[in-house]
Regions:
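Periplasmic-side early beta-strands and strand-to-turn transitions of outer-membrane beta-barrels
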Residues: 142-143, 155-157, 162-172, 176, ...
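Extracytoplasmic beta-strand/coil segments of soluble accessory domains associated
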Residues: 64, 68-111
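Gram-negative outer-membrane beta-barrel transporters
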Residues: 381-387, 495-507, 523-607, 641
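Signature of Gram-negative outer-membrane beta-barrel scaffolds
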Residues: 334-437, 452
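Outer-membrane beta-barrel signature, preferentially recognizing the C-terminal barrel domain
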Residues: 259-277, 310-318, 363-371, 416-431, ...
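Surface-exposed extracellular loop regions of Gram-negative outer-membrane beta-barrel proteins
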Residues: 250, 289-293, 345-354, 397-411, ...
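Short acidic/polar hinge/loop motifs at secondary-structure boundaries
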Residues: 111-138
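Conserved C-terminal beta-signal and adjacent last beta-strands/turns
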Residues: 6-9, 186, 234, 433, ...
Length: 671
């Protein structure tokens, strides 16, 4: 990739920092590897935290499944990162409509993780046991990189040195000849530490196609992927440190037919400076080099299949950074001011094939976009009352967009250049948190936000089954307005209950709109609005050795599109009910057991509600047996009762299914 030299240059920085850092005084210097502390007004916006114990002990071992603990979290489809097309892994919250791009801002140590071209999240590269905590905030976001958080934010924090064993490794074997291997070391170095880890998982995959629809070309959803992560933290003074992270990943998958292969890969690097002195500082720079390819196979008869489209190369680059300052303004205020920028550039190359296997068209499309924002927020504590509020001003540009097409011999047939566009977008949020006592707090918040259409939505068409969805270079940004109110109750030590009522309106929502005269033809368009309102409930508690956590979301979403056939209907891929509950038995020593129940209500495949995906209820379980000397025997089970999970319904009657019963046995070692 063309930015590899810069990635390697960034990779050298932590080594130099570690080598040149002055020998620390252990009595004065504490390296945490964390960011700045959360402002006191953060709870006003409501959030759910997933702790490290849960992250390290799930049935699937995959972050997107664990995020399902937060009811209302969803990807575009119900598949996980072993059987989904990578470009469909957009993350969203609050049933704001199915969209393969992420409406939720996903951050890892402050770095936006969305693919620069597609907007999807590389979930397979986000290994849960490398993380310390995940905090999910539903609703509009602000602060650094707040542009893009129209459905909330998912903040992932890397595990700190005190959470990481010096050496850890695990090996699992699962159903359908699946293997999962991981290892990591985290030695102290100078006054800081380095963490190097890697994971490789592969499997023959399950049949996503129902038995009565399989043909000669049908193939299971095989997958093979790996990722490595290097993180280094070094002290610069008693109150400041520098943090580096580099991630490499590669992922190959097959979906539905032999030869229907997809590939995604990435090289990410970031460097972050944290100062916890009188003037607190959080400065960050990052670079991402990503690529994607995908082959579309059609099976016109039960005995034949052919390649119809080869999306052979989609290189993209993301560059960005931020600086946040917290000046000393007194003990009652936490003021944050700063700026951030994100630049995305990408190209799409694809070849179209005829029924005879001859290239009939070669397409090349792409463009650039940039968002630069300035923000200020303050939290003011007045006894039991916390007031919080902030504003953002973002300058966005969409430029150099084009779509070119040539015939099979290379003669140009189409050359379209799209006009550059730019504008300012202003956002704000405000919240209040009032503690009625030690056991109860009430809160309320209002917010606005926006999201630019991705390069993928603007310039790249895609095909799923017999349905082709066209891009739309004229798309405008989505804009959110929202209100919510809630209560948090802690009736006893270790027990917490929370309830939130919300109203969100997403204006100019980007949706895949079906052509009324051809159900196999869709186009991305801005619709008037999607309105989502509902209730979210969470609960957690520990009694003796038993731990219970639960979450439920009711989301009543409708599309406002006067004059359109889908006006008043539920947006695609938006279930009305979602729930999750985990019951665990975790004594301080000895064996441990946990079981997780998840429910997702009926949702529609399309905007016209012609194809309904039935509801699904699944049960997962994990059992751990310590064997001594740092070795633990682990058994995991996904979808234990083998529930049939529908992930897609095609206009031709074709069906895709999600993960069936999957069993794992393995060992984990840490020292």
């Amino acid at each position: 990739m063309k930015y590899l030299p810069l990635s390697l240059a960034l990779a050298a920085i932590p080594t130099v920092a570690l080598a040149n850092a002055e020998a620390p005084d252990p009595a004065r210097i504490v390296v945490t590897g964390e960011g700045l502390a959360l402002p006191p007004g953060t709870p006003a916006y409501g959030s759910v935290a997933i702790d490290r114990d849960r992250l390290a002990n799930s049935a699937s071992g995959r972050i997107e499944s664990i995020l399902g603990d937060v009811a209302g979290f969803q990807q575009f489809r119900r598949s996980d990162s072993r059987s989904a097309n990578p470009s469909a892994q957009g993350a969203t919250l609050r049933a704001l409509g199915g969209n393969a791009s992420s409406r939720t801002l996903v951050l890892l140590d402050g770095v936006p993780m969305a693919d620069p071209f597609f907007g999807y999240i590389p979930f397979s590269a986000l290994v849960p046991d490398r993380l310390s905590v995940v905090r999910v905030t539903r609703g509009g976001g602000l602060g650094a990189f707040g542009a893009g958080a129209v459905a909330g934010a998912i903040e992932l924090a890397s595990a700190t040195r005190d959470q990481l064993p010096t050496f850890a490794a695990s090996a699992f074997y699962g159903s359908r000849d699946a293997t999962e291997l991981s290892a990591g070391i985290a030695p102290d170095l100078g006054g800081g530490y380095v963490s190097l880890s890697g994971r490789w998982d592969r499997g023959g995959g399950f049949q996503t196609t129902p038995k009565d629809q399989r043909v000669a070309a049908t193939a299971p959803a095989a997958y093979d992927g790996w990722s490595t992560n290097l993180r280094a933290v070094a002290p610069l003074s008693a109150t400041s440190e520098i943090q580096f992270r580099g991630t490499l990943f590669h992922d190959d998958r097959t979906l539905r037919f032999k030869g229907a292969d997809s590939m995604s890969e990435g090289q990410d690097a970031s460097i972050r400076f944290i100062s916890r002195g009188a003037w607190q500082v959080d400065a960050l720079a990052y670079i991402q080099a990503r690529n994607f390819s995908n082959i579309v196979i059609v099976a016109p008869t039960p005995t034949t299949s052919r390649k119809s489209l080869d999306q052979r190369n989609t290189p993209s680059t993301g560059i960005g950074g931020k600086i946040e300052l917290r000046p000393p303004v007194g003990p009652d205020h936490v003021l944050r001011v700063g700026a951030d920028t994100r630049i995305a550039t990408g190209d799409m190359y694809e070849d179209v094939y005829s029924a005879a296997g001859v290239v009939t068209a070669r397409r090349h499309a792409g463009g650039d976009q940039m968002t630069t924002g300035f923000f200020a927020e303050d939290d003011w504590t007045i006894g039991s009352l916390v007031l919080t509020g902030g504003v953002r001003a973002d300058r966005w540009t969409i430029s150099d967009g084009f779509f070119r097409q040539a015939n099979g011999t290379g003669v140009g047939t189409l050359n379209t250049a799209f006009a550059d566009r730019s504008d300012w977008q202003f956002s704000g949020r405000a919240g209040v948190l009032y503690h009625l006592g030690d056991a109860i707090a009430v809160r309320g918040a209002g917010y606005t936000g926006f999201r630019l259409p991705t390069l993928n939505e603007l310039y790249r068409p895609f095909v799923v089954g017999s349905v082709r969805t066209e891009a739309n270079a004229a798309l405008t940004p989505e804009k959110l307005k929202g209100l919510e109110a809630g209560v948090d109750i802690n009736p006893a030590t270790g027990v917490s209950l929370s309830a939130t009522a919300f109203y969100n309106k997403l204006d100019d929502a980007i949706a895949n709109v079906t052509d009324p005269s051809n159900l196999n033809a869709r186009q991305r368009r801005n619709v008037d609005a999607i309105v989502a309102k509902g209730m979210e409930l969470t609960a957690s508690g520990r009694i003796a050795d038993f731990l219970l956590s639960a979450s439920y979301a009711y989301s009543h979403s409708t599309v406002h599109a006067p004059g359109m056939r889908f006006d008043g209907l539920t947006p695609a891929q938006s279930p009305r009910h979602a729930a999750s509950a985990t019951l665990a038995w975790e004594p301080e020593q000895g064996p441990a057991l946990s079981a997780t129940l998840r429910y997702v209500a009926k949702q529609y495949e399309d905007d016209l509600q012609a194809y309904a995906l039935p509801d699904a209820l699944t049960v997962d379980a994990v059992a751990r047996l310590p064997l001594g000397h740092g070795v633990t025997l682990i058994a995991r089970g996904e979808n234990l009762f083998d529930e049939k999970i529908y992930t897609r319904l095609g206009t031709d009657g074709s069906i895709d299914l999600g993960t069936p019963r999957t069993l794992w046995i393995g060992v984990r070692f840490s020292r």
